[in-house]
Amino acid sequence: MTSRRWFHPNITGVEAENLLLTRGVDGSFLARPSKSNPGDFTLSVRRNGAVTHIKIQNTGDYYDLYGGEKFATLAELVQYYMEHHGQLKEKNGDVIELKYPLNCADPTSERWFHGHLSGKEAEKLLTEKGKHGSFLVRESQSHPGDFVLSVRTGDDKGESNDGKSKVTHVMIRCQELKYDVGGGERFDSLTDLVEHYKKNPMVETLGTVLQLKQPLNTTRINAAEIESRVRELSKLAETTDKVKQGFWEEFETLQQQECKLLYSRKEGQRQENKNKNRYKNILPFDHTRVVLHDGDPNEPVSDYINANIIMPEFETKCNNSKPKKSYIATQGCLQNTVNDFWRMVFQENSRVIVMTTKEVERGKSKCVKYWPDEYALKEYGVMRVRNVKESAAHDYTLRELKLSKVGQGNTERTVWQYHFRTWPDHGVPSDPGGVLDFLEEVHHKQESIVDAGPVVVHCSAGIGRTGTFIVIDILIDIIREKGVDCDIDVPKTIQMVRSQRSGMVQTEAQYRFIYMAVQHYIETLQRRIEEEQKSKRKGHEYTNIKYSLVDQTSGDQSPLPPCTPTPPCAEMREDSARVYENVGLMQQQRSFR
């Protein structure tokens, strides 16, 4: 499990319901301390627009649900029921599914806070990426609600006097919203505590001085808190000699990992294929390239096009798990590759094309026109394309195209080309709103077509703007599915798409733009939720303490995750006799989904 921030240390049952109903979706859950039984915990799960609360017993030896499986830690219990669907049931047999953790706000926006990280994982990180004095703060696994300061000591080789790598862990207690290390001064925040011990180093009992010299930063963030992360990344360097800072530092770190992605590109390097590449050194990886199957068997290179399949959940491909949406990242067409482009679109059953460049920019050809004029029909090798109509929006042109194979009349299908026209020749757009509106239209079109193949995305080289659009779309899809409190990781997502096509997201400006676009999306979503809550409260007068079981749905497609209104918290009371639903003991099963 990558995060244990589903644990909310300071909320009541009423507050848990309010959070789950306003910020979660069905399947969202959180854990919290039990108010009625101090030392125990409660699992709160949103189901069918309502919230079920499940008691978790902490005997001092193990955690369980007052019966059933026993676990050493709260995290292991939650992970087990997340992974083993069908094990957690009510007495009437209804399954309770833990799908989406509703994360607690991080106690700090500082990048040295890593959230859920085990001691071993912290040691591995500090040993591999840190140096003497590197530190991070993480959640305590053994004491939910507390934290741990992990510090690398020894020399820069990570070795202490006995020649072994050394990482020291210091427990940070959180009591009554104050933080301390088990004695001495108490602090109002984790940041205050860390800043204090940076200036006043702690000393271990054996005399080792714990110097907090430089933080080992994380790139994972809670999507809802992206504004705080952007603010941190936008800070200017403290001193003129400290060049690496914020966005530049993160992007440069990402660039340094390119050496890990040196996969073969032999097909693109073949002499016969060189004239099919717009740029001689921007070539597709062999392991993810689109292979054209309908070429001339006497011409082995007829299967080549400079394009790669991009799967958002690439690591699951080996498990035969098909992601909901995939992409084809490709270069802008050359005159001699237009026929191959349409062969690819037809073969992959792609119904949506995203073009992010003009045909000519700054006097240079970026992509030849690969579609006919409006109302015209044109043949491209074995493919026929008819331009049914064109319509212009503020930032883009939408073309409805009919694609078929020459001589095969029953093969005609509709392909929609979204041509984004307002990306500036230099840099990135000043306002991400236009890009987000554009991607929203693309998303709805793709969703509306049954069994549509990958979305084809191209610019000129097929890596810069193409990578930027794809990464933004992937991150927004995650938020759509899991809600605003999910974890996202921009560098990790870029690294994932780069493992499938080299060089995706080319500049620091594009990297920063991804953050700005996601921030803009989140802010729009949060305003929408606030307005819906206000509207519901004005339109309804609540006369009892029951919660609304009606999901907020509408006939039109919403670009934002669903949310369910709830009465003001002041009108509710926590009553253990009412709050807790009966949950039957788990039935032992052999097969898991």
From Swiss-Prot:
It is found in: Cytoplasm. One of its GO terms (molecular function) is cadherin binding. Residues 247-521 form the Tyrosine-protein phosphatase domain. The keyword Cytoplasm applies. The active site is at C459. Phosphorylated on Tyr-542 and Tyr-580 upon receptor protein tyrosine kinase activation; which creates a binding site for GRB2 and other SH2-containing proteins. Phosphorylated upon activation of the receptor-type kinase FLT3. Phosphorylated by activated PDGFRB. Phosphorylated upon activation of the receptor-type kinase PDGFRA. One of its GO terms (biological process) is positive regulation of phosphatidylinositol 3-kinase/protein kinase B signal transduction. The keyword Cytoplasm applies. Its EC number is 3.1.3.48. It catalyses: O-phospho-L-tyrosyl-[protein] + H2O = L-tyrosyl-[protein] + phosphate. The modification Phosphotyrosine is found at Y62, Y66, Y542, Y580. Disulfide bonds: none annotated. One of its GO terms (cellular component) is cytosol. Highly expressed in brain, heart and kidney. Keywords: Acetylation, Cytoplasm, Hydrolase, Phosphoprotein, Protein phosphatase, Repeat, SH2 domain. The modification N-acetylthreonine is found at T2. Acts downstream of various receptor and cytoplasmic protein tyrosine kinases to participate in the signal transduction from the cell surface to the nucleus. Positively regulates MAPK signal transduction pathway. Dephosphorylates GAB1, ARHGAP35 and EGFR. Dephosphorylates ROCK2 at 'Tyr-722' resulting in stimulation of its RhoA binding activity. Dephosphorylates CDC73. Dephosphorylates SOX9 on tyrosine residues, leading to inactivate SOX9 and promote ossification. Dephosphorylates tyrosine-phosphorylated NEDD9/CAS-L. The SH2 domains repress phosphatase activity. Binding of these domains to phosphotyrosine-containing proteins relieves this auto-inhibition, possibly by inducing a conformational change in the enzyme. Belongs to the protein-tyrosine phosphatase family. Non-receptor class 2 subfamily. Interacts with CD84 and with phosphorylated SIT1 and MZPL1. Interacts with FCRL4, FCRL6 and ANKHD1. Interacts with GAREM1 (tyrosine phosphorylated); the interaction increases MAPK/ERK activity and does not affect the GRB2/SOS complex formation. Interacts with PTPNS1 and BCAR3. Interacts with phosphorylated LIME1. Interacts with SHB and INPP5D/SHIP1. Interacts with KIR2DL1; the interaction is enhanced by ARRB2. Interacts with GAB2. Interacts with TERT; the interaction retains TERT in the nucleus. Interacts with PECAM1 and FER. This is Tyrosine-protein phosphatase non-receptor type 11.
